[in-house]
C-alpha cells in the first residue's frame, strides 16, 4: 500500500469512528469499533474492518444497518476529507479480535491445568 493510501486510510478510520459513533441513529447498528481501514493504491476502494460487541445475530444486524447507511457514510467522508473521489466502502468483520480472545482463553485454560 502506498504512503498516501495509508494516510488516507488512517484519516478515514478516525472520521468513520466519529460518524458511526455520533451521526448514525440506526438501531440495528450496535456498539462497534473501526479497527482498521485499508485503502487500495488508486484510492477507489476502502475495506473497513469492524469489531462488534454481541453475538452472531447482532453482528449480522449491524452489517445490514451499515449496508443501508453506506451512501450516507460515504457522503459524510467526502465532506470531511478532500479527495477527488471518495472511496467505495466495503465493511468486513475483523476476525483478529475474536482470534486473539480465543488464544487468550486457551492460554488461561492451560495455565489453570498446570497449577492443578
UniProtKB/Swiss-Prot annotation:
One Gene Ontology biological process: maturation of SSU-rRNA
Domain of life, per lineage: Bacteria
Keyword terms of this UniProt record: Cytoplasm, Ribosome biogenesis
One term under GO cellular component: cytosol
Cell location: Cytoplasm
The keyword Mitochondrion is assigned to this record: no
GO terms of molecular function: ribosomal small subunit binding
Pfam family, one: RBFA
Physiological role: One of several proteins that assist in the late maturation steps of the functional core of the 30S ribosomal subunit. Associates with free 30S ribosomal subunits (but not with 30S subunits that are part of 70S ribosomes or polysomes). Required for efficient processing of 16S rRNA. May interact with the 5'-terminal helix region of 16S rRNA.
Subunit structure: Monomer. Binds 30S ribosomal subunits, but not 50S ribosomal subunits or 70S ribosomes.
Record family assignment: Belongs to the RbfA family.
Protein name: Ribosome-binding factor A
